[in-house]
Amino acid sequence: MRKLNVLSVLILMLSIWMPLTVEAQMPTLSNKNKSDWWHPIGIKPYQSSKKGIGFISVKGNKFVDENGKEIVFKGLSISDPDKLKKDGKWSKKHFEVIKSWGANIVRIPVHPISVQQRGIEEYLTLLDQAVSWSEELGLYLIIDWHSIGNLRTELLASDAYNTTKKETFSFWQTIAAHYKDVPTVAFYELFNEPTIYDGKYGTCTWGEWKLMMEELIDVVYAYNKKAIPLVAGFNWAYDLTPVKDHPIAREGIGYVVHPYPGKRKIPREPKWEVDFGFVADKYPVVATELGYMNEGDDENLLNDGVYGPSIVKYFDQKGISWVVWVFDPVWVPQMIKNWDYEPTEQGAFFKDVFQGKFKYK
């Protein structure tokens, strides 16, 4: 009888806790507010109602489609869906305009504060809409955990970027489970811009960062082996020099760089090659942010008249995919002047590149 009681208790415990171990995810607001918290509400997988585009995978230093054909991505970042929703501009039209410009990929920056305020369930509703629209339009997506700073010490650049290692891992656990077998959501940019900011955010070695990213990639792959994790280097996602001797020890990934004009002086190409370009000879590289403007307070973004043409030519030579920041009339450097989608100077330039009007030679 005693053995039976012990067995019954074990079965009861398993029935209570099994959903949490099998369907691990970010804490949901509804569960926090539920009186019967021992019956958790799980986040269900995304259900596509459309036959979308095929899966992307890594082959050597290239991204390839299901037929093995190389794809070089050229696209843009939108602003955070939470901002767009509050602006009254979150709609399929936004993605239709992007498609009409000629982009083949959209980067979605997810700020920790927007998930914290809105809650993961409601935020996933926004992402699901983006996925549905992108499926219809034939666009691929990068989901970007848009934090800046040192994840090891959890010292971040501002309240908008504040997160923890646990929250970061839980976010990707949720995304990987929710969008498993969804080819449109091709890339997971694990952490936007790692930096120790000259020690102001504490210390973190490349070895420590490498181990953390490898652990996070393992979590992603446990849920979704078809995802392509993207890993950034230090110095606000600019410096990939440690990859030469100590690459991320996981297959199927890509590397991230944010080569804004202020990072290097003219001539930039030899320095780009040393800082990140060499990585593209062996692994896929995506410049998930780049861009410029003619005036403003941020010297890192200021145009010198040659940056745009020189960087797209360099990417073309190296086979590097790229994504321009940012398709918003307020966030800088802007690609559009207003919500009539009138392009700025950089917007017009990159639109021409998307549409094949730029002459590389």
Predicted regions and their residues:
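An active-site-proximal structural segment forming one wall of the substrate-binding cleft
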Residues: 87-105, 116-147, 153-187, 209-219
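NAD(P)H-binding glycine-rich loop region in Rossmannoid oxidoreductase-like domains
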Residues: 108
